[in-house]
A protein has these predicted regions:
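Glycoside hydrolase catalytic-domain context in secreted enzymes
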Residues: 1-473, 481-491, 495, 537-942
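Terminal connector regions
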Residues: 466-537
């Protein structure tokens, strides 16, 4: 039926309306098509219903309701901050009395940083404020100043991912009225038991922290010094606060180590400093209980606090330089940016403690006190502990050593302590000749004690496998080894005490050195009279795999790495004059390689089986029925599964695989790049590392996994196990520590907890992804020993010590090859040497030029973290049809993906009787269909 227009006005009106409808039709129909192409992403984002009904689930939540789970999350968050916060200074400041009245200073006191930005950003709408947490624990808080700050127009400007505007970055301190308004200064007389000053520093994905020139006002920079130094407004605040208060406490709300040396003396000295990191949504209650004294702090620093960043070896080559003969190719194509890890293995405490020993025993011109504020592993308590090494069992045949340590609480408060064990391998003439570096101390084990009452003791037993102390020799043995010589195991409270103990033992029988620090009785030493070589890998002999990642491979040994043989002569300098040779540029082109991967792919046999994925539950990975299943998958489904693996895996109807919903992290379930449901925001990984509590990490992994069950989430892009190479790295809140052993052990425990509920974790980012600037394709160069002993070490540990099912690669190049297409890294080391059979996924992909599909699949990659882009899917589909060898590799990837997701919560709700997917049409799909139908109908009538 057509509408009859009876007047020119009506005709004009309806003509205009027709144009509008035609325009809407042109816009909405393609939009609808695109929406259905990306239905998995939209389903994941728009599906906010909790999975309450868990009947017939392979993995069920341990909690009868989501409300009960959230209650536990709050309790666990408090427990984490109670165990993790680090007391750095306490001059008769803490704990406060039960009836204390305090005043909170700084704009940050009403606007704390709870988590990092970017992938670690989680909805914190229900966050607990510092004022509320203190008051709920019986401490009265000055309401007048709190209200003043809340009404202040000063705002802390933060940085945007991949587009940091350092000129706008502010500290946002508001000192103008707080010491001139009478009603405020009068309130200080009433709430004067303690002034609590909050110092905050943001960090997150896509940017590093400015080392100078930020916070630009009227053409001038207020932030002239580094962002991690105390700024003028903050120092002015502290100085004025001290006039009104006899007791001042600073809370460090930062994930990176700051230069707080000014707070330790003279006009800016405060009475107490407590590092609280990023406490997450509910963690502040734990902090308040420490301040009140209900909980005794037991956290130990996961990084080193230094005075001057220029003394930090890694800082000399940080941020990314451009090859001298090239210009910048763009923020998302950093092919001409590079960075050289010239500091080698000497990251954080490994440098400072080694330099300290050299200054004592070898006359190196180095002052520890002028460089280090607080050593790695440092942390005070309200009580005192004595640790005594009371015995050791050394088993030469088994290559093990067990230490027995008595820990006694000799103070007046109950509390926990952490036993830290550091090893030293003798630095020999062989090492000097073959360019093997050995730090003076390396964390090799740690254990947290039980809660000890005053005068109570605990015997802690620490078992050490000597192979874990191995070094890598890239020049002579070209594998791991333990050389002939002396070995030391030091029981200590921090890294500095550990080396002092060892020096004490070395010098106790000499008259030439009057070293009075340390306790030689807390060192166990032994001698190896034969060199031990470790060449046996899982399927491949261990040998050099990263010769081409060493810049000297291309520059004829032009670069000298930092060496303890002469720290003064080899201390790093900014390496800005490197030219890109023609050979190097040819590598950067990322040309497609032959599909001849070094790892074995079984021949696939064509079948007509109707086998479904669930039929293979509990079948061995190499069961021949897997070939039957894989050949039931169409080329289109294979390409979709592997090429569009962003925030979930694609469903496959033919084998009844429902696909999966995967989420970002690592502070909890944080949805994805497009939105989605956020879970509890737990304290940051940097803070959790200070707990030194493996059981706590296991509990955290399980708690997040329980929430994932309710959210219908299976994959979790966590934990972050990159190294805090530099305090100014923007993403330090997502990474545990500057120490690889601590990072690997804590990550392993988190993974173990999550695995119990069928959650597939993706520890990230493999590898050398230790800064954010120029991260998209930057070439990172390092020598083999450095890669293996520092940056690859956490991944090695999690593969060996946890049931990890996934690993995420990085944006950067490892040497000149993108991490996800580096065959030496993925195929040779991860797959063959370490025996990893899980899923290897890229970081987020969106058609970036250097992300070569062919080379990545050939290297052992399985999944592209692409969501809306069909670039990788289409390229995979094209190559499947034209290249049989490539298809074999794709089938191998599908095998790994499906095997791991079969043994996960993705299969919740399915059984052997399931003959088809539980497809239900989403509300958004119904809405689009109705809207499109109306458009067609209206166009027909007009």
């Amino acid at each position: 039926m057509k509408i009859n227009f009876k007047s020119k006005g009506m005709k004009y009106l309806f003509s205009s309306m027709s144009l509008v409808w035609i325009t809407l039709f042109v816009v909405l129909i393609p939009t609808s098509i695109n929406a259905f192409k990306n239905e998995r992403i939209l389903d994941n984002v728009l599906d906010n219903e909790l999975q309450e009904n868990q009947d017939n689930f392979l993995y069920k939540s341990d909690y009868s309701s989501y409300e009960n789970l959230k209650k536990y999350h709050k309790e666990l968050s408090e427990e984490i901050t109670q165990e993790s916060a680090v007391l750095l200074k306490n001059d008769s400041c803490l704990p406060l009395k039960n009836t204390a009245k305090v005043t909170l200073f700084s704009r940050n006191s009403v606007d704390l940083i709870y988590s990092g930005t970017g992938s670690n950003s989680i909805n914190i709408a229900k966050k607990i404020t510092l004022k509320d947490s203190l008051e709920s624990n019986g401490i009265s808080v000055n309401p007048y100043l709190n209200d003043y700050y809340k009404s202040s127009n000063k705002e802390r400007i933060e940085l945007n991912i991949d587009n940091p505007n350092y000129d706008a970055l502010t500290i946002a301190e508001d000192n103008e009225g707080i010491f001139t308004k009478g009603y405020l200064t009068n309130s200080y007389l009433k709430y004067n038991d303690c002034a609590i000053i909050v110092i905050s520093r943001i960090g997150g994905e896509g940017y590093d922290l400015p080392t100078s020139n930020f916070d630009k006002v009227d053409g001038k920079y207020k932030g002239e010094n580094g962002y991690l130094t105390l700024q003028k407004d903050e120092l002015d605040l502290i100085k004025k606060v001290k006039r009104y208060f006899s007791k001042t406490l600073v809370l460090l709300n930062t994930s990176s180590a700051m230069d707080v040396s000014l707070l330790l003396k003279d006009e800016y000295e405060v009475n107490g400093i407590l590092w609280i990191g990023y406490p997450g949504e509910y963690g502040l209650n734990g902090i308040s209980k420490i301040i009140k004294g209900d909980i005794n702090p037991s956290g130990k620093l996961p990084h080193t606090y230094i005075k001057d960043i220029s003394s930090y070896p890694a800082h000399q080559n940080f941020g990314g330089f451009i090859f001298k003969n090239k210009t910048n190719a763009g923020e998302y194509d950093c092919r001409y940016n590079y960075l050289i890890y010239q500091e080698g293995i000497y990251v954080g405490y490994r440098y400072y403690e080694t330099a300290y020993e050299s200054s004592i025993l070898n006359s190196l011109n180095f002052s520890y006190e002028d460089n280090v504020i607080y050593p790695f592993g440092y942390g005070l308590s309200y009580t005192s502990f004595i640790k005594d090494l009371i015995g050791a069992d050394f088993n030469k045949d088994k290559n093990t050593c067990s230490l027995y340590i008595k820990v006694k609480n000799v103070g007046n408060y109950e509390g926990k302590d952490v036993v830290q064990i550091y090893n030293q391998n003798e630095y020999t003439s062989f090492d000097k000749e073959n360019l093997v570096e050995k730090a003076s101390v390396n964390l090799i084990s740690f254990k947290k004690t039980k809660l000890l009452k005053p005068d109570e003791s605990d015997i802690v037993v620490v078992d050490i496998n000597l192979e874990d102390m191995k070094n890598y020799d890239a020049n002579y043995f070209k594998t791991y080894f333990l050389g002939k010589g002396n070995y030391y195991l030091s029981v200590a409270s921090n890294a500095h005490e550990a080396i002092q103990n060892i020096i004490s033992l070395k010098t106790k029988d000499t008259s030439s050195t009057s070293f009075t620090e340390g306790n030689y009785k807390n060192v166990y030493s032994f001698n190896l009279d034969k060199t031990q070589i470790f060449k046996e890998g899982n399927k491949r002999e261990i040998t050099n795999e990263f010769d081409e990642v060493n810049i000297n491979h291309y520059l004829n040994d032009k670069i000298t790495y930092l060496s303890r043989n002469d720290f003064s002569l080899t201390f790093p300098k900014p390496l800005k004059d490197i030219e890109l040779t023609s050979v190097m540029e040819n590598e950067l082109l990322d040309k497609s390689e032959d599909n001849s991967s070094s790892f074995v792919v079984d021949n696939q046999v064509k079948t007509n089986s109707n086998i479904k994925l669930f039929d293979l539950l509990n079948k061995d990975y190499n069961d021949p029925k897997w070939n039957n299943l894989l050949n039931n998958i169409s080329n289109e489904d294979l390409a979709d599964l592997i090429g569009k693996g962003g925030f979930g895996s694609s469903k496959i109807n033919s084998i009844v695989y429902p696909g999966s919903k995967d989420s970002d992290g690592p502070s909890g379930i944080s949805g994805n790049a497009y939105g989605g449901k956020s879970g509890t925001c737990f304290p940051s990984q940097s803070l959790i590392a200070a707990s030194r509590n493996e059981d706590l990490l296991n509990k955290l992994g399980l708690a997040i996994a329980n929430e994932a069950i309710y959210f219908k989430t299976t994959g979790w892009y966590a934990p972050g196990i990159n190294i805090q190479r530099n305090p100014y790295s923007g993403r330090n809140n997502e990474y545990y520590s500057e120490d690889p052993y601590l990072s690997g052990i804590l990550g392993s425990n988190l993974i173990q907890g999550a695995y119990k509920k069928g959650i597939i974790t993706y520890p990230k980012h493999l590898v050398l992804n230790d800064q954010e600037m120029h991260r998209h394709g930057i070439s990172i160069f390092a020598n083999e020993q450095t890669i293996r002993e520092i940056y690859l070490k956490p991944f090695e540990i999690i593969i060996k010590k946890s049931p990890v099912q996934g690993i995420m690669t990085s944006f950067n190049r490892v040497g000149l090859k993108w991490s996800a297409s580096n065959k030496n890294l993925l195929a040779n080391v991860l797959r063959e040497e370490l025996g990893f059979e899980g899923v290897i996924i890229t970081d987020y992909t969106s058609g970036y030029k250097w992300m070569n599909v062919n080379n990545s699949i050939n290297a052992g990659l399985n999944l592209f973290l692409a969501s809306s882009s069909d670039t990788y899917k289409n390229e995979i589909l094209s190559k499947i049809k034209s290249d049989d060898n490539f298809k074999k590799l794709v089938l191998d990837s599908a095998h790994k993906i499906l095997y791991n997701y079969l043994h996960s919560s993705a299969m919740n709700g399915y059984t052997k009787e399931s003959k088809k997917l539980n497809n239900s049409i989403s509300t958004w799909k119904i809405s689009i269909i109705i809207l499109d139908a109306l458009q067609v109908l209206l166009l027909y009538h007009f």
